Regions:
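FAD/FMN-dependent oxidoreductases across multiple families
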Residues: 216-220, 232-317
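C-terminal helical "tail/cap" subdomain of flavin- and related membrane-associated enzymes
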Residues: 2-3, 65-70, 87, 299, ...
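Conserved mid-domain beta->alpha element of the FAD-binding
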Residues: 7-25, 155-156, 280-365
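Active-site-adjacent segment of FAD-dependent monooxygenases/related oxidoreductases
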Residues: 38-116
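Conserved FAD-binding catalytic core of PHBH/FMO-like flavoproteins
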Residues: 83, 100, 110-267
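Residues at the starts of beta-strands that form the adenosine-phosphate
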Residues: 5, 28-31, 225
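Conserved Rossmann-like nucleotide-cofactor binding loop
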Residues: 14, 38, 161
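Glycine-rich FAD pyrophosphate-binding loop
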Residues: 23-43
Length: 413
C-alpha cells in the first residue's frame, strides 16, 4: 500500500489527523483538498477533551502537553431560583462534581495539528470537492473547477455536510434532532465579576427545555476566552430551514433567533449567567442545528470516511474532536497491519463504527435528558441530579470511550 496516491477531502482537525495517519504508514503522495480559502485557524470556539482520552491520544502522537490548554477540575450545576438576585447571582447550586477535561481553542489546536503534517503533504485551499466515486481500479475526485483526478484512496474528512459520504453511503442524510445549539466565545476581560466563576469550573446552567455549558478556553494569541454552548428548541415560525444540513450559515444569526435567545435568558437565567450570554456580540454568535448520523458501512474498497463525515453525534457527548482523532488512530493502526487496502479499510470501519454507534446513542440519550425531555430542574437536589445523570449516561461514555489498544507505538514523522 505505501506509495499509493491518496486524497484527503477536508483540511480541518479530522483532515490533518488523517493526513498524519496516512503519512506515518508510508503513504507520502497525499493531497488535502480544503474547500475554504480563508484561514481555518480563525475559528475560535471551544474544544473539550477528557483527560483519559487525552492520555491515549498523546501516547498515539496526536496531542501533547505543549498544546495550549486549560485544565478543568469541576462541573457545577446551577438553576435559577426565586432568590437568584444580587445575593445569589449564580443561582442555586444543585451539584458539584469532578470534571477532568482539558479545553482548547479550535484555531490554535488546528494550527498545532497542521504543523505536525509533514511538508511533503500537498494542501490545496479553495479546492471544493463536488463528487467522489469508486471505479474498478481506483477512485475519482471532482472539484468545482471541473477537474477530475484519479486516486488509489480517498479519505472523506469533510464534516457533517460531507460530499464524499454520498459515494460510500448513498441516501444517508443527517437527521435533524429538533433543536439548536447557540454558540458564542469572546475575550475573558469583557466578563464582569469574573472572580465569581472559577476558571477551572465548567458551569451547566439548566432551564426549562434546555441548558447551557460554559467554560474558559485559551485565547488565540494568549489570555483566555469565555466559551458557551446553549441547547434548546428554536422559536416556532417560518423562515428557519433547520431541518436541512444547509441551515443558517455560522455567524449569520437573524433577528428572530437573537430575540428568542435574549428572551430566554431574561426569563430563565440567574443574573450572572444572563450577563455572560448577553455580552456576546452579534459577530461572535452562531447557531448550529443538531443532527444524528452514522455511516454504516463507512468505507468502500477505495474510500473511507473519518470524523463527522462518518459519525455525526450531538456535542452533548463531550467528544467531538476526540472522535475525529480516535478515527485517525484507528485508520493508522489498520493501515499499519500490511493487509490489502480493502481489508485494511474494513478493519478500520469495524472499530470506528463501534465507537461511533456508542457516541450517536449517547448524544441522543443526553439530548432527551437535557433538552427534549428535561426534568423540572427546580425539583432536583444533589442526589436526584446524580441519579438522573447516571441514567442519562448509562454506558459511562461521556467524554468518549477508550480507543482499542494499539499494537505498536507511533512512528516518527
Amino acid at each position: 500500500m505505501p506509495g499509493t496516491r491518496v486524497a484527503v477531502v477536508g483540511g480541518s482537525i479530522a483532515g490533518c489527523a488523517a493526513a498524519l495517519a496516512l503519512y506515518r504508514t508510508g503513504h507520502h503522495d497525499i493531497t488535502v483538498h480544503e474547500r475554504t480559502s480563508g484561514e481555518l485557524s480563525a475559528r475560535g470556539v471551544g474544544v473539550a477533551v477528557h483527560e483519559g482520552r487525552y492520555t491515549e491520544l498523546a501516547a498515539a502522537g496526536y496531542l501533547d502537553p505543549a498544546m495550549t490548554h486549560i485544565k478543568l477540575r469541576g462541573r457545577h450545576w446551577y438553576v435559577r431560583s426565586p432568590d437568584s438576585g444580587p445575593a445569589a447571582p449564580l443561582g442555586r447550586l444543585i451539584r458539584t462534581e469532578s470534571f477532568d477535561f482539558r479545553t482548547y481553542n479550535w484555531g490554535p489546536l488546528w494550527r498545532e495539528l497542521r504543523a505536525r503534517v509533514p511538508a511533503g503533504v500537498r494542501f490545496r485551499p479553495g479546492s471544493a470537492v463536488t463528487a467522489a466515486a469508486e471505479t474498478s481500479d481506483g477512485a475519482l475526485l471532482t472539484t468545482a473547477d471541473g477537474t477530475t483526478d484519479r486516486y488509489d484512496l480517498i479519505v472523506g474528512a469533510d464534516g457533517y455536510r460531507s460530499v464524499v459520504r454520498a459515494a460510500v453511503h448513498p441516501g444517508l442524510r443527517p437527521a435533524y434532532a429538533g433543536y439548536l445549539a447557540w454558540r458564542g466565545a469572546y475575550p475573558e476581560d469583557r466578563l464582569p465579576d469574573g472572580a465569581l466563576w472559577d476558571p477551572a469550573s465548567a458551569a451547566y446552567v439548566v432551564f426549562p427545555g434546555g441548558h447551557v455549558v460554559l467554560y474558559r478556553i485559551p485565547g488565540d494569541r494568549g489570555g483566555r476566552r469565555v466559551n458557551w454552548v446553549l441547547y434548546t428548541a428554536p422559536p416556532p415560525g417560518p423562515g428557519l430551514p433547520l431541518d436541512s444540513p444547509g441551515g443558517p450559515p455560522p455567524g449569520r444569526v437573524g433577528t428572530v433567533l437573537r430575540e428568542h435567545l435574549a428572551a430566554l435568558t431574561a426569563a430563565h437565567f440567574p443574573p450572572f449567567w444572563r450577563r455572560v450570554i448577553d455580552l456576546t456580540e452579534p459577530g461572535e454568535l452562531f447557531v448550529q442545528p443538531m443532527y444524528d448520523a452514522l455511516a454504516s458501512p463507512g468505507v468502500t474498497r477505495r474510500i473511507a470516511l473519518i470524523g463527522d463525515a462518518a459519525t455525526v453525534a450531538r456535542p452533548h457527548t463531550g467528544a467531538g474532536a476526540v472522535k475525529a482523532l480516535q478515527d485517525a488512530t484507528l485508520l493508522e493502526a489498520a493501515l499499519r497491519d500490511g493487509a490489502a487496502l480493502p481489508d485494511a479499510l474494513s478493519a478500520y470501519d469495524s472499530a470506528r463504527e463501534a465507537l461511533g454507534r456508542t457516541m450517536v446513542g449517547l448524544g441522543r440519550s443526553l439530548g432527551t435528558a437535557l433538552v427534549t425531555g428535561a426534568p423540572d430542574w427546580r425539583t432536583l437536589d444533589d442526589a436526584a441530579l446524580a441519579a438522573w445523570w447516571r441514567a442519562a449516561d448509562a454506558a459511562g461514555a461521556f467524554g468518549g470511550t477508550r480507543t482499542p489498544e494499539r499494537t505498536e507505538p507511533p512512528r516518527d514523522t
